């Protein structure tokens, strides 16, 4: 007789560091998605000439490119001994930049927010990857990396949807996206301290989950040198 195959391997729990890093990265990705689409709608909505539209898109695009380049260099050189803490700080800075852009409502501050956000998302993603690499056994990492990418893409889509649907005044757009970032930041901070604003989503977790396999040597982690 054939017996049905049952996968008896327990599901690998996620520790507080990974949960915090996921919440922070998702919060930042919302603003990344927003900034990818919103400036184009702002440029097209105003009765400006082609050069003025090019100025808006070029300034924000250049700022985002410079920020991404700087963030990748910084993440390669940083010692990610406390990746969750790095993500928390990046989320605070990004949320503050979005609020500043909402208050100022001008192009230069929006470009500065794009630069900060692009740098922060590169550093935060490297920190999340370091948490997954260090906190999970090898058998669970591939699945965890795949699921985290799916969650981050969903957060990006949410931010992009806000950029498409919201009114095309800079202060209105950044106010709307800040209204999403602030709860995300709050959840990130609460998760870092071991709680959760949403029952069942990150609360009451150990800093490091109990692993079902050997934990890799921190010295071998990317950025540890």
Regions found by a protein language model. Give the residues of each.
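Helix-to-coil boundary motifs at intracellular loop junctions of multi-pass secondary transporters
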Residues: 42-50, 81-82, 102, 131-136
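Substrate-agnostic recognition of the 12-TM MFS/MFS-like secondary transporter fold
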Residues: 20, 24, 28-32, 64-76, ...
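Juxtamembrane intracellular "pre-TM" segments in multi-pass secondary transporters
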Residues: 1-30, 204-217, 221
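Transmembrane alpha-helix termini and helix-breaking/packing motifs in multi-pass membrane transporters
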Residues: 44, 157-181
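Structural signature of the two symmetry-related core transmembrane helices
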Residues: 85-100, 178
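A single, central transmembrane helix in multi-pass transporters
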Residues: 9-69
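Helix-loop junctions at membrane interfaces in 12-TM secondary transporters
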Residues: 102-114
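Multi-pass alpha-helical transporter architecture, strongest
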Residues: 176-213, 217, 224
């Amino acid at each position: 007789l054939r017996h049905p195959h049952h996968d008896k391997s327990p599901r690998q729990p996620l520790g507080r560091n990974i949960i915090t890093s996921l919440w922070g990265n998702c919060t930042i990705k919302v603003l990344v998605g927003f900034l990818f689409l919103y400036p184009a709608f702002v440029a097209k909505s105003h009765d400006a000439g082609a050069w003025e539209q090019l100025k808006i898109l070029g300034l924000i695009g250049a700022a985002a490119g410079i920020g991404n380049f700087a963030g990748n260099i910084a993440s390669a050189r940083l010692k990610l001994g406390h990746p969750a803490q790095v993500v928390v700080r990046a989320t605070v800075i990004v949320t503050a930049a979005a609020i500043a852009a909402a208050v100022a409502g001008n192009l230069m501050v929006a470009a500065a927010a794009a630069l900060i956000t692009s740098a922060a998302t590169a550093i935060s993603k490297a920190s999340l990857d370091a948490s997954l690499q260090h906190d999970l056994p090898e058998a669970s990492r591939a699945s965890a990396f795949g699921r985290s990418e799916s969650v981050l893409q969903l957060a990006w889509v949410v931010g992009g949807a806000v950029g498409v649907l919201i009114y095309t005044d800079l202060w209105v757009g950044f106010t709307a996206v800040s209204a999403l970032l602030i709860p995300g930041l709050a959840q990130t901070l609460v998760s870092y301290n071991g709680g959760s604003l949403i029952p069942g989503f990150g609360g009451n977790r150990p800093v490091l989950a109990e692993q079902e396999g050997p934990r890799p040597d921190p010295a071998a982690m990317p950025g540890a040198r």
